[in-house]
Amino acid sequence: NYSELKNSMVEADPEIIIHMAAQPLVRKSYTYPLETFNTNIVGTANVLDAARSCKSVKAILNITTDKCYENNEDGRTFKETDALGGHDPYSSSKACSELVTDSYRKSYFENVSVGIATARAGNVIGGGDWSEDRLIPDVIRQIYEGHKLKIRNPNAIRPWQHVFEPILGYLILIEKLYENCKEHSTSYNFGPEETNVLTVKQILDLAKKSLNQVDYEIDQNNDMHEAKLLMLDIKKAKQKLSWKPKMSMDKTLFSTLSWYSSYYESKAIFDYSKEAVEEFINGEN
């Protein structure tokens, strides 16, 4: 509802807008392509257009995805200057969201000192994710709730990272964008070091070492196209934002699985989450 969004934004009178709302699932995008395109493309345009009515706005950050690149499966590590594209509706919609953001930046915000950037993160994991068709939540549901775990693409390679990593990057970027809109009104990749670029099967094997209960089967009926290889070049974020990933894959997985274990053991999950954030901020990784 554009009118409601605009009225709410004007009433809030924000200086900073971070747009994270999306239809985020590849398989769901095949089933509901129009919903996906409407949410991820028109939704982005609605946010940016509503922001034009807010004289207080100084910085806008649109969170997209590593899947926004044209992926020809040629082993490329994607840089921010690489071509955008997308085979499935989700990936395509996020590439379009990038283009919509760039158009609004150039058409309406370039001469009014409002910084607009986009952030492209890899496969994030971490406690509190209950989404469907996500590897770690599906593993957790198999262990604690007895659900069957079906794996679509065990050899798919992904840039895995704890959710704390890109969030820290977003906060650094939005601060830089607020202070210097011209220099930082661009796109940034936020991904892991190469040691965290692993196959789905490797992640499952690591999880099995910690939990000893991971049991899965390969989905032989999966005929939906998904990228086999995704890797991000993060030199730009390192150089311009002084950001870099902190957590090893072992620590990333341990932290994630520990959160879910604590949740199912009915521990004080808010306090546990707060301690995990403080540990990350203090660099205890």
Indicate where each model-derived feature is located.
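Short, glycine/charged-enriched secondary-structure capping and boundary segments
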Residues: 31-35, 51, 74-78, 131-135, ...
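C-terminal substrate-binding subdomain of Rossmann-fold SDR/epimerase-dehydratase oxidoreductases
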Residues: 123, 143-285
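Proline-centered turn/helix-capping motifs that create local helix->coil transitions or kinks
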Residues: 69-74, 108-114, 129, 144, ...
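N-terminal Rossmann-like NAD(P)+-binding domain of SDR-like oxidoreductases, especially those catalyzing
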Residues: 1-121, 125, 258, 272, ...
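Residues in well-ordered alpha-helical elements
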Residues: 3, 15, 27, 34, ...
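The catalytic Tyr-centered alpha-helix of NAD(P)H-dependent dehydrogenases
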Residues: 85-93, 97, 132-136, 159-163
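A short, amphipathic alpha-helix embedded in the catalytic core of nucleotide-handling enzymes
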Residues: 47, 104, 138-143, 169-173
